[in-house]
Design a protein with these regions (language model features):
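Gram-negative bacterial Sec-dependent N-terminal signal peptides
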Residues: 1-18
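Proteolytic maturation boundary segments
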Residues: 12, 18-37, 217-256, 267, ...
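Histidine-acidic residue clusters that define the catalytic metal-binding segment
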Residues: 20-29, 150, 168-208, 236-244, ...
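M16 family metallopeptidases and their MPP-like homologs
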Residues: 40, 45-71, 85-129, 159-185, ...
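Conserved GTPase G-domain substructure that encodes guanine base recognition and part of the catalytic core
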Residues: 70, 284, 732
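Extracytoplasmic/secreted cell-surface and envelope-processing proteins
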Residues: 85, 218-222, 276, 332-333, ...
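Non-catalytic, conformational "gating/processing" segments within enzyme and secreted inhibitor domains
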Residues: 144, 164, 193-228, 420-421, ...
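Short, conserved secondary-structure transition motifs
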Residues: 148-154, 244-258, 361-370, 562, ...
């Protein structure tokens, strides 16, 4: 009743039109200036997401300037009148640094996920940026360098190259013919005036939809929105581009790739999100992606390394992708022929009715899972309103429910015409082995110290003046079954679903006999073949009957409507404890793994990682073991079964259950499903041993498909996951390379435009630690960027961080702990990680107190004691640095 009264009262504060809904948790309003607002109350966590959707993207850009909308998105982070760049970055960092933007075809999104108490600040930022943005020539010249690094990064991806060519052919003559990324030549011609014109034309309240989800007071929130946005004037919008899709012609694309396996692909044009046939296309896509379908079966029968199907939907059209993998040197023509045969059958004979029914039911059930994440819920509402031009995420439910097998088959016949297909073959190629570097020079004086103290706008100062411990709203129950299996339960009532994740703590490089490397990978692939009581198709049909998603292996998961939780857990346990492991399936999976490894061990990514690990760890370290075609070819089914028996133990397993379930019911169901599982013998040690300091070195791994270098500076550190100093290291790493306001980002991107992104991280294990800094840049900028990295690390050792930096980093770390509760998935994975490390489930509260008490001297001392600026291994993947 209180929610209803509150909803009715909102009509008094909108100053514009108000539309009631049947859901008391959903509030809608349209301000007088045309801004549409949707507020969805979600009490999952003390967290809120704001998504500002501007109904303009790469569709609306001028001819010849495909990246204009993308560039404007970048410049929105360079500041606005009344909100400087430094202020914006400081605010974003203070709120937890969970902010970003995304440019799509017809929509550009700006989103914040923040603790609830920071909602007002997030709204102030959005309103300020709608009013105007700073787009001076000097700022654009700097940001152009960063965005061109992003272009280089994506153009280094063979998949992106494929998508670019595909779109050019599939959507010729329409705005969809190009991606929104942009090109270097077009950015070289783009001026700051061009960008300002785009912003001033399209960034208007009557061309925007603001979605707010989280634990908020709808009435107070809407009042804030009106106060901040209500006086922004509406604008007269230009005509939007039209879409006149021409009949597709069959085309073939051939590309080299640095992927470890080859890919044969087929693509067709699908209906879009706003088309009448969208629901049918969605069900068709899900049916063809079914684990009971012939495409998925390709990866289980030996006809391909894998078979996948996906539908990618834009407002006015979609793309259907069918992919099949083949080993390096394999017969791509044969794989392609098998792939084509599947879709010829779908076009002429239709899709099996039972797969259509299961796909339809699963699509309806999946709507409920969108409620299990605060930012995910905002995305769902944004997609429904801004992309699909619908009323809510649920308004597609009736359309999906009405889809019939006959409609699906009619669409399949129309879509999968071979004369309309685009075919692609991505063939793995060698780029050469890693080679030692000659050292890196560079100007020592380039750049400068990070920005000094930033004075925040008055409307933001109070929010960050005082540090507060985060509100941790989770209250898990934990129990251990008689067989040693740990179960953690976090009840949540925001949806009628339950999500389960679990892990068996294993390590094949410590547990598998020498010469059997890869046994764990073959074992995990065999969980797709059903159980000892149900074959593969029967097992998947049982999951489909309860609209559940399940995976098994050393890591396992289940997502199921809460009414089917018991049955879902029974099926998960049956798969985990009684995998069928048929001999024929073993032979196929062994062959597939062998073929995949033949390409993997020659791929630039693998060679790069192998060489880096070899430079960090001593000879003979178990972390240097890896599977080879020979080690996998030598395995027997008995080897795999023995490894399973020895390593899959309940006393090495944790299960986390989050959702619409009580601890008592979860305990009862878990005991019934997993209680019969037994362990024999002493518990194994699955943790790598401690290692000494590494020696400094440099090397380059060639990658012929890359135009940009991926650079890692890494070294071993005398710290592990239980070291008392880890909190100082984490906080210091946050200041050094943890976000837009970090030293590295300021020096390498904001001031110099050398890189698109740069970050630092400390990866700690039970007995060893590793500190890394990663960035991507052009080959001629590697040395210059590295010089700045080393300088900034030394600065952390030589000079205490400022009070302002420490305060901001603490605020960010404290808020990030609150943001870790924003979804079922993040809650479950956090608890699973803590359990696997043997830490208490209230470790976040303990960490918060440690961060609150941290001093600049403690951070400086840890960096001085544990980091070695002259000890980094510099690993470059891509063209040789110049």
């Amino acid at each position: 009743m209180l929610r209803l009264v509150g909803a009715i009262s909102l009509t008094l504060v909108t100053g514009g039109a108000f539309a009631a809904t049947n859901d008391a948790n959903v509030t809608r309003a349209t301000l007088d200036n045309g801004l549409r607002v949707v507020i969805v109350r979600d009490t999952l966590a003390p967290v809120v997401t704001t998504e500002m959707n501007y109904l303009a993207g790469s569709d609306e850009v001028p001819v010849g300037f495909p990246g204009t909308a993308h560039a404007v998105e970048h410049m929105m982070f360079r500041g606005s009148p009344g909100l400087s760049k430094d202020q914006l970055l400081a605010i974003a960092s203070d709120m937890g640094d969970s902010f970003n933007a995304d440019t799509t075809e017809g929509v550009t999104q700006y989103f914040f996920t923040v603790p609830t108490q920071d909602l007002g600040v997030a709204l102030h930022v959005a309103a300020t940026r709608m009013r105007g943005v700073d787009m001076g020539a000097a700022d654009w010249n700097k940001e152009r360098g960063a965005i061109e690094q992003e272009v280089s990064r994506d153009n280094s991806s063979p998949i992106y190259k494929f998508i670019t060519q595909l779109r050019g052919q599939m959507f010729a003559g329409t705005p969809y013919a190009h991606t929104g990324l942009g090109t270097r030549p077009s950015f070289d011609k783009t001026t700051a005036t061009d960008l300002r014109k785009f912003h001033d034309t399209w960034y208007a309240p009557n061309n925007a939809i603001l979605v707010i989800t989280g634990d908020v007071d709808p009435g107070a929130t809407l009042q804030q929105v009106k106060q901040l946005f209500g006086d922004i004037p509406r604008k007269t919008l230009p005509a939007r581009p039209s879409f006149d899709f021409k009949p597709m012609q069959a085309q073939t694309i051939a590309l080299p790739t640095d992927l470890p396996v080859g890919v044969a692909a087929l693509a067709w044009r699908l209906p879009g999100l706003r088309d009448q046939d969208y629901a049918t296309a969605l069900v068709l896509s899900d049916a063809l992606a079914s684990k009971r379908g012939k495409l998925f079966e390709m990866g289980l029968s030996g006809k391909a390394l894998f078979g996948q199907f996906a539908g990618s939907f834009m407002p006015h059209a979609g793309i259907a992708f069918a992919l099949a993998g083949f080993p390096r040197g394999g017969d791509s023509a044969k794989v392609l022929k098998n792939l084509q045969a599947i879709f010829a059958e779908a076009a002429t004979q239709g899709v099996p009715a039972d797969l259509v029914t299961a796909a339809r039911n699963n699509a309806i059930a999946d709507l409920e899972y969108k409620k299990n994440s605060v930012p995910g819920l905002a995305n769902a509402w944004s997609e429904a309103l801004a992309f699909r031009d619908g009323h809510s995420p649920d308004d597609i439910r009736a359309a999906i429910a009405a889809v019939t097998p006959e409609q699906v088959n009619a669409l399949a016949k129309r879509i999968f015409d071979p004369s309309h297909a685009i075919t692609a073959i991505l063939t793995p190629t060698s780029s050469g082995k890693p080679s030692a570097g000659k050292g890196f020079g560079g100007a020592e004086s380039f750049g400068g110290a990070p920005s000094g103290t930033v004075t925040l706008p008055t409307w933001a100062q109070a929010a960050f003046a005082k540090l507060e411990l985060p509100r941790i709203s989770t209250n898990p129950s934990e129990f251990t079954l008689s067989n040693g299996l740990k179960v953690i339960v976090q009840p949540e009532t925001v949806s009628k679903t339950v999500e389960v994740i679990g892990k068996v703590q294993t390590n094949q490089y410590l547990q598998a006999p020498k010469g059997q490397e890869g046994v764990a990978d073959v074992l995990n692939s065999l969980f797709n073949f059903g159980t000892t009581s149900m074959n593969r198709l029967q097992f998947q049909a049982a999951l489909d009957a309860i609209s559940a998603h399940e995976s098994a292996g050393s890591s396992f998961s289940l997502a199921v409507p809460s009414t089917n939780f018991k049955k879902g857990m029974q099926l998960l346990a049956d798969n985990e404890l009684h995998p069928a492991m048929p001999a024929q399936a073993f032979a196929v999976m062994q062959h597939n793994q062998e073929g995949a490894l033949a390409g993997l061990i020659q791929s630039p990514g693998f060679l790069h990682t192998l060489h880096l690990d070899g430079a960090l760890y001593p000879a003979g370290d178990p972390d240097l073991r890896h599977a080879t075609p020979k080690s996998v070819a030598g395995l027997t089914l008995a080897d795999v079964q023995h490894y399973y028996t020895q390593t899959f133990r309940p006393d090495m397993t944790t299960i986390v259950i989050v959702g619409d379930i009580t601890p008592a019911d979860a305990h009862k169901v878990a005991e019934a499903a997993f209680g019969s599982w037994k362990a024999a013998g002493p518990k194994p040690d699955t943790h790598y041993p401690a290692v000494p300091d590494n020696k400094a070195s440099e090397f380059n791994t060639p990658d012929s498909s890359a135009v940009q270098d991926s650079v890692t500076l890494a070294e071993t550190i005398p710290m592990d996951e239980n070291s008392p100093d880890r909190f100082a290291m984490y906080l210091g790493s946050q200041i050094l390379g943890g976000g837009f306001d970090a030293h590295l980002m300021q020096d390498l991107r904001v001031k110099a435009g050398l890189v698109y992104g740069v970050s630092s991280s400390a990866r700690l294990q039970k007995h060893r630690g590793r500190f890394s800094i990663d960035y991507g840049c052009d080959p001629d900028k590697v040395a210059e960027a590295r010089t700045l990295v080393i300088r900034d690390v030394k600065q952390m050792q030589d000079t205490p961080v400022t009070d302002a930096e420490l305060h901001a980093a603490k605020g960010k770390m404290l808020r990030s702990l609150a943001l870790g509760q924003s979804s079922f998935d993040s809650i479950a994975n956090n608890f699973l990680s803590l359990s696997m490390q043997g830490k208490p489930l209230d470790a976040d509260s303990i960490a918060a107190k440690k961060y609150m008490a941290m001093t600049a001297a403690e951070i400086q001392a840890v960096f001085e004691k544990d980091l070695r600026p002259g000890g980094f291994v510099t690993a470059v993947k891509g063209p040789a640095p110049k």
